[in-house]
């Protein structure tokens, strides 16, 4: 009998939360934080720590996201950067998104990104 009462109470609480406005929910969160000495910002801090970890990364993959309008120039740049033949470079550009280079140092990755973007490509460093 006690479990049924608790389930009904939980259902009532959920129904009230669904009907509450954003301001009321904000006040509820603040009240819960004060009452129980917790903070709702903890997951945000964990995400920020992950971002700092990524900033310290020392090797990157240079991904060609899109060749853009200047496909021929991008193919030439890919050939110059990778040493691939014309057919292979064209295949890589046509197959975008694709990694142009993997595991390169941050400075080299930025250079490659600049060359490819100058040629008209869209690049992502991962």
UniProtKB/Swiss-Prot annotation:
SUPFAM superfamilies: ClpS-like, Ribosomal protein L7/12, oligomerisation (N-terminal) domain. The keyword Calcium does not apply. It holds the Pfam family Ribosomal_L12. Transmembrane segments: none annotated. InterPro entries: Ribosomal_bL12, Ribosomal_bL12_C, Ribosomal_bL12_C/ClpS-like, Ribosomal_bL12_oligo, Ribosomal_bL12_oligo_N_sf. Keywords: Ribonucleoprotein, Ribosomal protein. One of its GO terms (cellular component) is cytosolic large ribosomal subunit. It comes from the Bacteria. Belongs to the bacterial ribosomal protein bL12 family. Forms part of the ribosomal stalk which helps the ribosome interact with GTP-bound translation factors. Is thus essential for accurate translation. Homodimer. Part of the ribosomal stalk of the 50S ribosomal subunit. Forms a multimeric L10(L12)X complex, where L10 forms an elongated spine to which 2 to 4 L12 dimers bind in a sequential fashion. Binds GTP-bound translation factors. NCBIfam families: L12. This is Large ribosomal subunit protein bL12. It comes from Streptococcus pyogenes serotype M28 (strain MGAS6180). The gene is rplL.
